Every structure is written in structure tokens, then in C-alpha cells.
């Protein structure tokens, strides 16, 4: 494997340290302006023309360098991060990049500041290898991904001409639990829903249990009516729009090397829902829509005992969706189900702005270039993942811009993304950055192909 040159390794660490030092926590709405300005400065150092585009929330850093008559590659990344809490579990300051044992620790090291710096270093490396590049470059770096990218769909629609590109790189990627390179081709959509219920004017003494409805029981019954023990959603019409897997997608599902035992060990479970295993496990994980209960709250949850009859209850749900499901149809279907099953008193409201599902054809020529580059760099075939179980604003890039986005990068399952002690490994930085370089060289027909 070719390593990133020493001077670019130093540049990677310096640039990442600058970005990690700014606590751009999306949920708290702080640090966005400073981080956007710093990202813009770093992109400007690459010779790109930089603009900070305002949105209803955090600004988008837009940067471009077009080559007349040549194709263009688009990079999507984000500069916001998750909160660092709980701080006491960090072994070093989350906002000071810290190196130990071949790893770089800090909030955003993997998600997503390290990935962004890796792309920038890859472009510098390419120019050192080939001189002026024979393709254009566009960056769109947002500051609200960690809170659901509420403004990205409208931003892409408004800037579609400025963002027009031929191929693209998504903000994340890396290796699986067996250190095999992955190439992810899609993301699920998501609709977050809040359920609320009130059965009395205020909490009561539990002595009223024989005669007054308990909101906790009722909410539990309502939630239990939504899916069966194997995870099958019981809402009428929920699966009507689900797109059947193509022959190619089914082929890639069946080709995924077994990872059942590794995931069971990591999750601490003995059995998957419905006893799924092998390709059926992958089909469910990648291609099935789901209903998940994020949390339920009612009554007293403190120490000791409080004999209370809860008068209200709430539940937070998320629906992970697949093509061609419409996230805006979920709440009407859910309300109809609740009404039909005698839970008309349970209110359902859409939470955060939903995200649509999207997929790229695994056999698209650009993804084939990426797969070939990954096999070359890592020494083993890329694991083609038809769709991640996670979500993100992929839909406007794939559907509005019609850009095939490749998902590869510098992370690994142990990176502690969204958790204390988030980090990346140096050898993943070398491999992931070089994979970006080789993908672009293969696509552009430069260097050894």
C-alpha cells in the first residue's frame, strides 16, 4: 500500500487539529460561523473559489474550480459535530486533537472533519502527482448534518446549477468489522415522529388505578400495536411503495461475506429478529424499512418509589425508509392505524424535517472505478453495500443533481463515532486517502489505471 507522503501527513494533522479545536456542535448551534470560515480558508488554499452561502440555519461552504469542457467531481461533507457529553468518559480533551497509539482522538476526527481533511489532502496529493488536474472540483460542506440537514434539500434545489457535477464523494466511509473496505451505494430515509397522550388533567394517586386510565399502559399498548415481534410493521399501506431489489442489488447482497457473528458479539445479542442470517440478514439490514422506538416517557423514573398514576405519556419513534417510500405519508398512515385500532386519543406529529431514501446503481461506472481502487489499495475486494441502515441528505444529490455518490473513507467500526473517545487510525487515513486518489485517477484516466 502506498502511504500518504510525510509532508501531507503533517498537513493532515495540522488541518484536522484546527477544525477539531472549534466545538461546532450542531445541536447547540455554536461554532458554525468560525468553523465555516476555517473550512473556507482551507479550501481556498487548494486554489478553489470559496463562498459562504447562508441558509435558514448554519452556512454552507461552497467552493469550486471548474475546468472548461471537462467533467466535475463533487464532494459533500459537513463541519458540525455531535455533543461531547459525557465529558468524564473522554481520556483527553475532546476539542484538542490528541495522538496516541497510532490513533488521532477528538470530536469530529471521524465524523466528519477527518473525512473532509482526507478529501482535501487527496486533491493536494493528486496535483503533486499530475500537476493541474483535468477535471473540475466542487465542495458543498454544510453545518447541520448532525441535526438532520433541515436546509440541505432546499439548498441543493436552489443551487443546482452551481452544484452541477458528473460524479461525487459522500461524506463518510471506511472498513467493516473484518477490516474489509466497504463501498456503500445508498442511504435509508428517516421520518421522526412524536406520539403524545393525556388521560387525565394531572398525575393522580395510584389508588385511582381501578377506575382511571393509566397513560403509561395506554401508550405502551398503542406502541405495541405498531409492529410484531419479528419487526414487521403492522401499519396498513406501510410497505406499498417499497421498491423490489434489482437483480444486481440481490447479487451484491448475497456476495456480502458473513458478518453475523461479529455483529452479534459487538451488540451483545444471541439472535437477530426473525432468526435472520446470511443474505436474509443483509436484505433486512439494507433493504427493509423499519419502525424503531427511540424512547418512552411517563410517570416517575427516579430513585425509590412514587405511587403515581401517570396522566400523560410520550413516545419518540423513527421510521427508516427505503425507495420509493415517501416520508410525508408516514404520519397519515400512522394516524389511520391508531384510529382504526382504538387509539384515536394518541396524537402523532412529524418531528424533525424528514430525509428521503436514495440509492446509486452499484454497477454505475464511477462506482466500479471506486470498487477497483479499493481492491487495489486494500488488497481485498470491496464489500458492496447496497444501502446503509443509516440516513443522510443523499436524496437531493442523487435525484435532484443526478450525481452518483461514492461512499468510501477513513473510518472503522471502532471509531466511537458520536461517543466519547472518537478517533481515527493512522493506517486508515493512509488507505482511505489513497483510495480517493486512485478512484479519481481511474475515473479521469490519469496515472496507472
Regions found by a protein language model. Name each.
Residues 79-81, 140-149, 171-176, 199-202, ...:
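Acidic, glycine-rich active-site loops and adjacent beta-strand->loop/helix elements
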Residues 82, 177-178, 234-312, 320-333, ...:
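An extended, acidic, His-containing surface patch that forms the Zn2+-binding/catalytic region
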Amino acid at each position: 500500500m502506498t502511504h500518504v507522503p510525510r509532508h501531507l501527513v503533517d498537513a493532515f494533522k495540522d488541518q484536522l487539529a484546527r477544525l477539531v479545536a472549534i466545538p461546532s456542535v450542531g445541536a447547540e448551534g455554536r461554532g458554525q460561523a468560525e468553523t465555516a470560515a476555517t473550512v473556507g480558508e482551507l479550501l481556498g488554499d487548494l486554489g478553489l473559489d470559496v463562498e459562504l452561502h447562508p441558509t435558514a440555519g448554519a452556512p454552507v461552504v461552497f467552493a469550486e474550480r471548474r475546468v472548461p469542457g471537462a467533467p466535475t467531481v463533487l464532494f459533500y461533507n459537513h463541519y458540525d459535530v455531535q455533543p461531547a457529553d459525557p465529558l468524564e468518559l473522554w481520556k483527553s480533551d475532546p476539542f484538542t486533537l490528541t495522538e496516541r497509539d497510532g490513533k488521532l482522538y477528538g470530536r469530529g476526527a471521524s465524523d466528519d472533519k477527518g473525512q473532509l481533511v482526507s478529501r482535501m489532502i487527496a486533491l493536494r496529493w493528486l496535483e503533486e502527482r499530475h500537476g493541474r488536474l483535468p477535471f473540475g472540483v466542487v465542495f458543498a460542506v454544510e453545518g447541520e448534518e448532525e441535526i438532520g440537514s433541515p436546509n440541505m434539500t432546499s439548498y441543493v434545489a436552489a443551487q443546482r446549477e452551481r452544484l452541477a457535477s458528473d460524479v461525487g464523494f459522500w461524506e463518510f466511509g471506511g472498513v467493516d468489522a473484518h477490516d474489509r473496505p466497504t463501498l456503500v451505494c445508498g442511504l435509508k430515509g428517516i421520518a421522526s415522529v412524536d406520539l403524545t397522550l393525556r388521560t387525565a388533567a394531572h398525575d393522580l394517586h395510584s389508588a385511582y388505578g381501578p377506575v382511571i386510565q393509566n397513560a403509561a399502559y395506554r401508550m405502551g399498548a398503542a406502541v405495541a400495536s405498531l409492529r410484531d415481534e419479528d419487526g414487521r410493521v403492522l401499519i396498513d399501506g406501510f410497505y406499498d411503495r417499497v421498491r423490489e431489489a434489482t437483480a444486481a442489488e440481490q447479487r451484491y447482497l448475497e456476495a456480502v461475506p458473513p458478518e453475523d457473528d461479529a455483529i452479534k458479539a459487538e451488540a451483545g445479542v444471541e439472535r437477530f429478529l426473525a432468526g435472520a442470517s446470511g443474505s436474509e440478514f443483509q436484505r433486512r439490514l439494507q433493504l427493509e424499512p423499519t419502525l424503531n422506538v427511540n424512547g418512552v416517557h411517563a410517570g416517575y423514573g427516579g430513585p425509590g418509589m412514587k405511587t403515581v398514576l401517570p396522566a400523560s405519556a410520550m413516545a419518540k419513534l423513527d421510521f427508516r425508509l427505503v425507495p420509493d417510500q415517501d416520508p410525508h405519508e408516514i404520519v397519515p398512515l400512522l394516524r389511520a392505524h391508531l384510529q382504526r385500532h382504538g387509539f384515536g386519543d394518541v396524537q402523532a406529529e412529524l418531528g424533525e424535517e424528514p430525509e428521503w431514501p436514495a440509492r446509486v446503481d452499484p454497477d454505475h461506472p464511477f462506482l466500479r472505478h471506486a470498487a477497483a481502487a479499493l481492491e487495489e489499495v486494500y488488497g481485498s475486494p470491496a464489500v458492496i453495500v447496497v444501502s446503509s441502515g443509516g440516513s443522510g441528505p443523499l436524496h437531493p444529490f442523487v435525484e435532484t443533481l443526478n450525481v452518483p455518490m461514492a461512499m468510501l473513507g477513513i473510518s472503522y467500526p471502532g471509531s466511537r463515532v458520536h461517543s466519547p473517545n472518537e478517533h481515527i487510525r493512522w493506517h486508515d487515513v493512509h488507505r482511505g486517502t489513497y483510495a480517493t486518489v486512485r478512484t479519481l485517477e481511474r475515473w479521469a484516466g490519469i496515472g496507472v489505471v
